[in-house]
Amino acid sequence: MTKQLRMYTVKPGEMDAWCEEWRDKVVPLRRKHGFEVLGAWVIEETNQFVWVLEHEGKEDWSVPDARYYESPERKGLKPDPARHLEKTPHWFVRDP
């Protein structure tokens, strides 16, 4: 099982809109593609949104991730929820 930590910087004034679109559009679509969201948090002081995503498949992470981004449903998200984001770094993490 592979886990990824994502730490997004959200554009000023757009956190509520981002959270709503993430919750209503991104999360259900990620789940449809075999991902599970393990947790999500807002850091008000830095205008950041942090979440942890997991995929249990035996495939390399890039395979289901590409399927997600290339899916008609993801391409059809209009407007694109990513418009709320300034930076989107992410890292693979493991349990200690």
Question: Can you annotate each of these PLM segments?
Answer:
Residues 6-7, 42, 47-64:
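Accessory recognition modules or surfaces
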